[in-house]
């Protein structure tokens, strides 16, 4: 679909606690964990690690244990680890397509000292995943999570020459550990219950960065299908927020960041098929933005939590919306006028919630039809005193190799990141511009 998104697969999702139940001793040894590691346990709290992206903390009714759910794509925890072994207990579910049985598990990415070493799917229920196995850490088998049914969750292991460091029991290793949620909550959730280390280990948060950016967007921001090919059907294995323009731009600028992005979403309508004529309004960004994660809360019957806008105060908010609205507006004047009005109101609301932030509206890589409306909205808002700028994206040329469903490939996403990085350096971060601020 060259100008839209695919629909979320129809299916039912059980709460992870239901998937984790066993006949006896569920609270002590949940499904997937035959034994908790000896040593120390660490809660996923701000005192132990840096937490970026919106997160929801929920206490399980059956277990009484707290889990910190990473909400939107690109959310992560990061800390400096000194020790010998490190593992993480995670709780998850997945969406299953009722038509063909395709499963859409959550995908995570593990970085050690800022190098990607592994992408792996989460299994439903609660499982223990080794992040830095002790001793035999250079062997691929060491990456398999504990599963009583014998299924491994090895994932994609990337080579890192110094992964194990010195295997001597006398030596401790020190490195920066970053665990990132790569895929979307509409497909699968990911909750962190605890990290486990050896007895002598220490964990401490990494430093916060001076620059802070928030990205609001749709599947392009999520990295939908970015790891796939045109002939591939979408799967969460092909989705990677880290390979999309937003995260790449933030990393190039050495900025802390958070994403509020959702495939298929729009301002006045989600993506609809050409044969449909009514807008799809069940999940729209202006309403979603006000809550920490209304989709996750609705799935599990939790009360929606209002987002605390004081918890992350960006200098820049980047908005990438309109591609899915175009599937409904279709060049019809009345619909486009409504889009422009609602777009303006949403930007005003973003400004009210983030009064210290500059706002950048970017658009055009997959669809050009609503570009004049976005530009007109930006001009009107700027004239009324809202600190907003327009960044026009280079459209994908006909015949360009794409990712899944006509979405930008990794190469196109990289070009988008380079363009936006340069724009932000020239327009926003002029005073602290550095010559080495670029994507390597």
Regions found by a protein language model. Give the residues of each.
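N-terminal secretory targeting modules
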Residues: 1-4, 31-143, 149, 154, ...
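Structural recognition of the beta-strand scaffold that forms the well-ordered cores
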Residues: 212-216, 221, 257-261, 315-320, ...
């Amino acid at each position: 679909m060259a100008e839209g998104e695919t629909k979320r697969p129809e299916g039912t999702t059980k709460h992870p606690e239901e998937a984790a139940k066993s006949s006896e001793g569920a609270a002590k040894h949940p499904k997937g964990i035959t034994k908790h590691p000896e040593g120390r346990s660490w809660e996923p709290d701000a005192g132990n690690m840096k937490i970026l992206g919106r997160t929801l903390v929920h206490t399980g009714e059956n277990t009484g244990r707290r889990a910190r759910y990473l909400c939107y794509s690109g959310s992560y925890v990061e800390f400096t680890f000194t020790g010998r072994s490190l593992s993480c207990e995670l709780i998850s579910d997945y969406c299953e397509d009722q038509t063909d049985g395709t499963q859409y598990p959550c995908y995570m990415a593990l970085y050690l000292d800022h190098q990607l070493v592994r992408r792996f799917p989460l299994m439903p229920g609660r499982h223990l995943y080794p992040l830095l196995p002790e001793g035999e850490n250079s062997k691929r088998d060491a990456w398999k999570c504990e599963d009583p049914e014998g299924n491994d969750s090895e994932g994609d292991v990337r080579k890192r020459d110094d992964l194990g460091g010195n295997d001597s029991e006398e030596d401790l290793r020190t490195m920066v550990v970053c665990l990132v949620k790569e895929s979307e909550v509409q497909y699968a959730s990911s909750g962190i219950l605890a990290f486990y280390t050896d007895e002598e280990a220490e964990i401490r948060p990494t430093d916060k960065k001076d620059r802070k950016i928030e990205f609001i967007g749709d599947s392009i921001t999520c990295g939908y299908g970015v790891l796939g090919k045109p002939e591939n059907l979408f799967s969460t294995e092909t989705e990677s927020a880290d390979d999309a323009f937003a995260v790449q731009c933030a990393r190039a600028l050495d900025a802390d960041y958070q994403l509020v992005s959702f495939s298929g979403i729009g301002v006045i309508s989600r993506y609809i098929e050409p044969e449909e004529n009514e807008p799809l309004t069940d999940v729209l960004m202006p309403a979603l933005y006000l809550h920490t994660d209304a989709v996750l809360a609705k799935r599990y019957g939790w009360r929606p939590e209002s987002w605390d806008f004081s918890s992350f105060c960006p200098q820049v908010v980047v908005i990438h919306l309109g591609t899915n609205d175009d599937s409904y507006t279709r060049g019809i004047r009345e619909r486009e006028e409504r889009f422009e009005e609602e777009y303006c109101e949403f930007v005003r609301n973003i400004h009210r919630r983030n009064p210290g932030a500059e706002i950048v509206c970017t658009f055009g890589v997959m669809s050009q039809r609503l570009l004049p409306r976005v530009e007109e909205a930006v001009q009107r808002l700027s004239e009324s005193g809202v600190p907003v700028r327009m960044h026009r994206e280079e459209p994908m040329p006909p015949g360009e190799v794409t990712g899944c469903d006509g979405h930008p490939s990794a190469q196109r996403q990289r070009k988008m990141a380079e363009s936006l990085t340069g724009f932000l350096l020239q327009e926003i971060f002029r005073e602290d511009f550095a010559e080495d601020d670029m994507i390597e």
